[in-house]
Amino acid sequence: MNVILLDKIANLGNLGDQVAVKAGYARNYLLPQGKAVVANESNVKVFEARRAELEAKLAADLAAANQRAEKIAALEAVVIASKAGDEGKLFGSVGNRDIADAVTAAGVELAKSEVRLPLGALRTTGDFEVEVQLHTEVKAVVKVSIVAEA
């Protein structure tokens, strides 16, 4: 199925690209989320008319993500207290939601889907650098310090 992308999508293309994707991916993800439209003659004309508006929206999203990245870079280490044993091993773990909530409490809005933990949840006390992806082009690093609750 050929679609016209209305947003930049990682590993697929940029705004305005006509790409061939599997029908299920288009029907179940791209079209309902408003990230693409079916590539037919009428939609191509409508897209060309809206292209400037969509590019401006994309630029505004990128600028907002860059501002959030600067705020995150300015943050001191975010401290998360969790129950832990004598050797620093946590009873449980610190995951995406915990990190997102702690950063939001520190003053920078962060969704749990933006936190990247490629090795899984954090299970020990200590200092960690966690990557957050605010936009397809914007990444930032949050310093997280996990301490044992008294």
Curated annotation (Swiss-Prot):
MF-aspect GO terms: rRNA binding; structural constituent of ribosome
Pfam families xref list: Ribosomal_L9_C, Ribosomal_L9_N
Single GO BP term: translation
GO CC field: cytosolic large ribosomal subunit
Keywords (A to Z) from UniProt: Ribonucleoprotein, Ribosomal protein, RNA-binding, rRNA-binding
Gene3D superfamilies per the UniProt record, alphabetical: Ribosomal protein L9, C-terminal domain, Ribosomal protein L9, N-terminal domain
Keyword set includes RNA-binding: yes
Keyword RNA-binding recorded: yes
Domain of life of the source: Bacteria
NCBIfam families (UniProt xref): L9
Function: Binds to the 23S rRNA.
Family per similarity comment: Belongs to the bacterial ribosomal protein bL9 family.
Family matches, as PANTHER family: 50S RIBOSOMAL PROTEIN L9
Protein name, as recorded: Large ribosomal subunit protein bL9
Organism: Shewanella oneidensis (strain ATCC 700550 / JCM 31522 / CIP 106686 / LMG 19005 / NCIMB 14063 / MR-1)
Gene symbol of the encoding locus: rplI
